[in-house]
Structure formats: C-alpha cells, structure tokens
C-alpha cells in the first residue's frame, strides 16, 4: 500500500494501524473509525460516510495485502456499529467486500470476515433481509469450511440470521426459493445440514408458507435423506414429516401433480429409508388427491408393483406399496370407459386421512416410516382437490398403464405377488373399462396365454379370471368369429380357426343328420373361440402343461365361463386337429373331467336325459371328437343313456386293434361304472326288460377284458342282475311290456356309427404309417 496516498478522512495513524499485523493495533484503529463515523452521522454527512466505507472496502478489505484486508474488515464492522440504525442505508457497500473475503485462502481472514459480518448483521437486524440471498449463499459455503474456527464463526452468524428471519414478517420467500433449490443439491455433509436447518426454521415461521414451494425442493430433500450421516438423515426425516403433516392439514393448496413424478422416482431407489418414505408420501397423495393422480398411474405402478414381491426384510415397504396399489385401483371407475372427454375432478369434503409418510426420486423415506407409515388404510378414500387442479379435467389413459402391466407380466423374473397384482389390475380394468380395454386385448392375449404355464396355482387362477372376462365381455363381441377352413375343415395347429356356426365338423358329409356344429353361445364373444383355439395349441405344444395343469385349467374355466360352451368349442376344434395322438389325449382329458368333476354336475345332468335340442346338439358335437378314443365314446353313451348305441360301438371293437392301452381304458371304465356318477346306470340294471342293451353292452365289455380284477368286478356286478321273471309283479303281468328309452329322432345313430368307423380307420392308418417308418429305419440300421 502506498504510504503517501491520501486516505482522508482516515488519518495516517488510522491507516497505519489498520495495516498492522497485530490485531490489537487494528482494533484501536477500528475504535477511531467508529468515533469518526459517529461524528459524520451526527453531522448527517453522508458523503464522508460513503467515502470512509468505500476507502475501507477498496483500499483495505479488497487489498492484495492480508493484513490490510484484516484491517478493512474490522474497519467496516466499526462503521456499521457507528451507523447504528442508519447502517441499513449502506448495507450493500458494507456487506459485499466482507462476503468477498469469505473466499479467501487464509482461514484466519475468513474467520475475521465472519466476525465482521456478524457485527454488521447484528446492528442492521431486519434491514439485512433484502440482502438475505447473498448472505445465505456465503454462509452455505462456510458451513462446509474445513477450518473449525471458521465453521464456528459461521454458525454464530447463522444463528443470528435465523433469529432475524424468525422475528420478521418481511422475508422474501419467492426470491429465496431459486437459491434454495440450487443449494439443496450439494453433496457436502455440512452444507446439507445447513440447508436442512434453514428449511426447519422457515417451516416454523407462521407467516412463511413453504408448502407452496415444496415441488421446488422435494427432490433435493429426498437426495439428502440418502446421506451417510445418521444425524442429517434424521433431520431430513423430521423436515419431510412436517411437510407431510402440513400437506394433510391443507390438501387444497398442495400441488400434488407437480410432485407425483418426484415420488415415483424415489419409490424405485435401492435405499430402504428413501423408498419407504417416498412410498408413504405416495400413499397419502393418492388418498388425498384422488383422481388428480390418475395421469401418473403408469409411473406409480412401475414403482409400486415390484415392491409387492418383497420379503419380510422389507415388509414395511411392501405393506405401504400394497395400500398404494389398492387406493389407485379404486380411483378407476366405469365412467372412465366413456369416450375420451375429460371429466372434471370431483371434490369431496373429507375428514382427516390416515397418517403417513413421504418420498421421491432415487431414495425413499421421510415423514416417519416408523409410526406414521404403519397407519391403517381406511376403506373410504378421502379426496381433496388441490386449488390448482380444481375442475381440472382428468382422463384415464390406458395405453401407459397397460404397457406397464404387460411388461411386468412378461418378465419371468418378477415375483409371484407382483404377477398376481398385475392380473388383478387387468381384471379390474376389464370390469370397469371393457370398451377401452378391448383395444389392448390383442397385445395382452399372448402374454396371458403364456402365463398359464406359471408355477403358481394362484397366478393361473387370476390369469384364467382375466381370460374368462375377455372371453365373455360384450365389448369383445364381433360378428365374424374367424375365416372358414378348407373343404375338410382340417388345419394344422398354427392355422386353427374358430368353429363356425352351422358348419359341419371333421369327416362330416353334407346333409348329415345330427352332426352340425351348434350355434355359438350368445354370451361368448369372438375372443372366447380364439382363447379355446390357443389354449388347445398351448396344450399341444406343452404336453407337460396338459399333463400337470390341464384338468385344473379346464375345470376352473368351467366355473368361470359356460361349461357347455367350453366343451362344445373344444370338441369342435379337436375335429380339425391333425395330430391324432394329441386329439386322443385331449379327448381323454375332457372325458375324465366331464365324468368326474363336481363342477360339471349340471352339464352331466343335461346330457343324461338329452331332453332339449341343445343337449342333443352337444352330445353329437362331443361324440364326433370323442370318437378319437373308442372307450371314451362308450362312456359318453353310458352317460347319455344311449345304451343301444353303446352296444353297437362295442360290437365294432372286434374290428379294432386291441392294445394294452385299449384294455387299460376298458379297465378304467369298469372302475368308473362303480363310482357314484353312474349310480343311475347301476339302478337301471334292476329293470332288465327295459334296458337289455345296457346289460348286453356291459357283457360286451366283460368279454373284452382278460381275467383281471376289473373282469372280476364287472362279473360280480352282472351276477347281481336279477332274473326278470322273479321281479314280475301282478300289476306288471297285466301291464304292457315297458320299452327302453327311445332313441332321439333328431340324432342319426347310424351316421354317428359311420363317423366312428371313419375316425378309427384314420387312427389305424396313422399307426401303420408310423410302424412302417419304424420298420424302414430298422432295415436301414441292419444294412
């Protein structure tokens, strides 16, 4: 510094002392400056006051010499003390050079800057608020200062500034928020602590409504919640908890929509605390905002669905996610199936909603995951409409939702509970919005069919519920069930088509009586037939599925849909099956289900009497496919009391190739005759004269069997058939002989028998072709 330079009104002694390396001498100079400035204040000499401040700022505080800078800082503090209440007029000039020194490399100088600014602020009090942003910016940097003395000094200044803000009603929150939003993303532990402490202070001031600006800082708060320091995490939890309480107190002023995606992001983090807190916030948002959250459904489901498969280690997160999922599902109503004209949000007045937590973006937790997150979920969702969203149109856009559900269902690595939740969502959407969902059925159908191979029975049950709803929904009704097949109506698996009402079945000739396909059931739509076709294709390509789960799947479908339609359509489709081995296996499975399942009691009764055209039509349809298995065909005739035709069929068995499998099936049929299902048949043995063909058919089976346990069983049963003369009563002698049950005139049994012969001939040809290929291969090996 040039000693000859004029620093008036500062005296040479003051200048010399300010530049001294000793603190005591600089302090003496500061007292002289204070005295000098007081005189200028008394004289109202603002020109000289400004000159003194400018000199101390430019020539000392911003000097290149460290001792000069220290002198300038203490001098500026002295000016502020001397100015007293008038210091507010000169705050910009007083504060700026001091803040510049906050960045000094010398830690002692940074400490003196803190001390100087403390004195300036202490004198000015509320007058410093217009300069709050620059003060906050400087303090936020010092909060992370490595020097403990500097940090201690900054904490004193920080407390003073907080006191001033708390007692003032002139704080410029609007101007401060951009700075807070920027600083909140600091990764420094101390800077984060500083930020959180200020948010806590601002939240506690009644005149400051920080909730309006929560969307600006919520993401940053969740970032801080993931800090490694326990103390900082706890502070952040407290802050988020306070915000959540305010949200529940004043939901009408909360900008739910602006924060929804923030929560969705943090619900997907790997940090348990962040995820739990974000999930708790999301739960409260869904319950408080109601349909306002619907546009964010796809994101919410992306975050929530994987959590439903968590184990007990993350039970809290799983429970809260489950409530979120249920609450969101309840927001979808039948009105959402109307044309895409946005509906205004309905505002409900509601009582206090259950206590909970908050969260967002990468992390998860805050708002007290301990107690508040465990609150019970009330069945009635309290819905408040935010002021900003009042009367705002809310339309349910299914594209994103269905895409998320489809993605999760297609992911084989996803947990069972998540898959079940996805299927529940799909079922709910098909129930509430069938018209809109029908547009997505083509994309969903393949993955729903694939899900039938799931390892979990519960998943398969839910999957079948969805498929059944698709198959029976009026929204999927079309007039064209599919293209016709070729002249013989036989196609490969990849070309299976839906049966066409009125068209003849496999090997059927024009004009054949009783062999027409029955009309489709009115309650079923085109997807029903597509479902049946693809289900059989799946059974054909995955024989393990048919073996392990086939009966289970078909029985459940009979409960969910119309059993007659299922058997009718499958029988029609099997007529077009080229793989005769699969057709035989499938017929055997269907016959076993028909004869043994309690779910089909009503259908068995319908077939037993053949009193209606529908039942006779069904019998003919089943018969044509049942012909793939001779013994099952006989069992169908027994079920429908067509004993004469059963006897005629058994007579044809002499022309068939009798194999071990064939005899095993006869054995099983004999065992089945002894079951409760055929109680009526056994009772009819008492009326020998009316049922001669039943007895002849049973004797025919007996003659087919070798001397086995089944032979003994049936033989003993037939031995119990009474002598008709012994049963003759006096009234019976007078009465005309009772004829057996008359064959239905609408069924051409001769044609049915011819059909049976044709099918069996086809089976024989296929077996011979296979054996021929086998012999040819054997000869090649020998050669």
Curated annotation (Swiss-Prot):
The modification Phosphothreonine is found at residue 11. GO terms for cellular component: endoplasmic reticulum; endosome membrane; PAS complex. Disulfide bonds: none annotated. It is found in: Endosome membrane; Microsome membrane. Residues 774-778 are annotated as: Mediates interaction with the PDZ domain of NOS1. It comes from the Eukaryota. GO terms for biological process: phosphatidylinositol biosynthetic process. HEAT repeats lie at residues 5-42, 89-126, 171-208, 212-249, 439-476, 561-599. The modification Phosphoserine is found at residues 518, 744. Residues 331-373 are annotated as: Disordered. Scaffold protein component of the PI(3,5)P2 regulatory complex which regulates both the synthesis and turnover of phosphatidylinositol 3,5-bisphosphate (PtdIns(3,5)P2). Pentamerizes into a star-shaped structure and nucleates the assembly of the complex. The pentamer binds a single copy each of PIKFYVE and FIG4 and coordinates both PIKfyve kinase activity and FIG4 phosphatase activity, being required to maintain normal levels of phosphatidylinositol 3-phosphate (PtdIns(3)P) and phosphatidylinositol 5-phosphate (PtdIns(5)P). The C-terminal domain (residues 523-782) mediates pentameric interactions and is necessary for the formation and maintenance of the PI(3,5)P2 regulatory complex. Forms pentamers. Component of the PI(3,5)P2 regulatory complex/PAS complex, at least composed of PIKFYVE, FIG4 and VAC14. VAC14 nucleates the assembly of the complex and serves as a scaffold by pentamerizing into a star-shaped structure, which can bind a single copy each of PIKFYVE and FIG4 and coordinates their activities. Interacts with NOS1. PANTHER family: PROTEIN VAC14 HOMOLOG, TAX1 BINDING PROTEIN-RELATED. This is Protein VAC14 homolog.
């Amino acid at each position: 510094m040039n000693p000859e330079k004029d620093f008036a009104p500062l005296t040479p002694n003051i200048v010399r002392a300010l530049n001294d390396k000793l603190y005591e001498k600089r302090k003496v100079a500061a007292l002289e400056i204070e005295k000098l400035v007081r005189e200028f204040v008394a004289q109202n000499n603002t020109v000289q006051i400004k000159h003194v401040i400018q000199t101390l700022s430019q020539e000392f505080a911003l000097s290149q010499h460290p001792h000069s800078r220290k002198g300038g800082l203490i001098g500026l503090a002295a000016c502020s003390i001397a100015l007293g209440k008038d210091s507010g007029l000169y705050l910009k000039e007083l504060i700026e050079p001091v803040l510049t020194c906050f960045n000094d490399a010398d830690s002692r100088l940074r400490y003196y800057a803190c001390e100087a600014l403390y004195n300036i602020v202490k004198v000015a009090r509320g007058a410093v608020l217009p300069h709050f942003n620059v003060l906050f910016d400087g303090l936020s940097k010092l909060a992370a200062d490595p020097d403990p003395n500097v940090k201690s000094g900054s904490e004193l200044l920080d407390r003073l500034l907080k006191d001033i803000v708390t007692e003032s009603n002139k704080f410029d929150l609007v101007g401060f928020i951009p700075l807070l939003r920027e600083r909140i993303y600091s990764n420094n532990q101390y800077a984060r602590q500083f930020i959180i402490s200020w948010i806590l202070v601002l939240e506690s001031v009644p005149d400051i409504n920080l909730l309006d600006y929560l969307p600006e800082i919520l993401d940053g708060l969740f970032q801080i919640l993931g800090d490694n320091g326990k103390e900082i995490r706890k502070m952040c939890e407290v802050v988020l908890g306070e915000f959540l309480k305010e949200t529940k107190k004043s939901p009408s002023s909360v900008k739910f929509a602006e924060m929804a995606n923030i929560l969705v992001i943090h619900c997907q983090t790997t940090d348990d605390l962040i995820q739990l807190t974000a999930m708790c916030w999301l739960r409260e948002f869904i319950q408080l905002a109601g349909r306002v959250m619907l546009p964010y459904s796809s994101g919410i489901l992306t975050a929530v669905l994987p959590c439903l498969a968590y184990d007990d280690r993350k039970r809290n997160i799983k429970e809260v996610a489950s409530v979120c999922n249920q609450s969101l599902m309840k927001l979808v109503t039948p009105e959402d199936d109307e044309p895409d004209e946005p509906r205004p949000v309905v505002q409900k007045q509601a009582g206090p909603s259950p206590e909970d937590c908050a969260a967002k973006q990468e992390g998860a937790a805050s708002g007290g995951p301990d107690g508040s997150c465990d609150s019970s979920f009330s069945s009635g969702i309290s819905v408040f409409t935010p002021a900003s969203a009042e009367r705002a149109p809310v339309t349910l856009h299914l594209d994103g939702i269905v895409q998320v559900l489809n993605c999760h269902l297609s992911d084989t690595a996803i947990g069972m509970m998540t898959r079940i939740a996805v299927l529940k969502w799909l079922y709910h959407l098909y129930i509430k919005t069938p018209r809109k969902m029908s547009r997505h059925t083509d994309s969903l159908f393949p993955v729903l069919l694939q899900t039938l191979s799931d390892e979990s029975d519960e998943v398969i049950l839910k999957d079948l519920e969805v498929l059944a709803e698709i198959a029976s929904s009026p929204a999927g009704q079309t007039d064209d069930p599919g293209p016709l097949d070729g002249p013989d109506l036989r196609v490969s698996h990849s070309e299976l088509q839906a049966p066409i009402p009125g068209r003849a079945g496999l090997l059927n000739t024009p004009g054949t009586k009783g062999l027409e396909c029955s009309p489709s059931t009115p309650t079923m739509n085109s997807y029903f037939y597509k479902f049946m076709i693809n289900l059989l294709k799946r059974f054909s390509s995955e024989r393990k599925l048919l073996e392990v789960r086939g009966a289970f799947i078909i029985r459940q479908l009979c409960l969910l849909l119309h059993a007659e339609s299922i058997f009718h359509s499958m029988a029609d489709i099997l007529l077009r099956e080229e793989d005769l081995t699969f057709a035989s296996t499938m017929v055997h499975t269907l016959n076993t289900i028909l004869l043994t399942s309690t779910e089909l009691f009503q259908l068995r009764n319908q077939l037993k009497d053949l009193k209606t055209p529908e039942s006779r039509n069904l019998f003919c349809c089943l018969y044509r496919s049942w012909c793939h298995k001779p013994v099952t065909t006989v069992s169908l005739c027994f079920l429908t009391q067509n004993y004469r035709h059963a006897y005629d069929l058994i007579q044809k068995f002499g022309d068939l190739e009798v194999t071990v499998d064939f005899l095993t099936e006869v054995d099983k049929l004999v065992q089945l005759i002894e079951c409760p299902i055929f109680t009526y048949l056994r009772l009819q043995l008492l009326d020998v004269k009316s049922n001669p063909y039943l007895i002849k058919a049973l004797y025919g089976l007996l003659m087919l069997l070798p001397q086995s346990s089944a032979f003994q069983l049936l033989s003993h049963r037939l031995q119990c058939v009474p002598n008709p003369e012994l049963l003759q009563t006096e009234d019976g002698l007078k009465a005309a002989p009772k004829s057996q049950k008359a064959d239905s005139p609408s069924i051409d049994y001769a044609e049915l028998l011819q059909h049976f012969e044709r099918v069996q001939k086809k089976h024989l040809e296929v077996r011979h072709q296979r054996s021929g290929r086998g012999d040819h291969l054997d000869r090649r090996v020998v050669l």
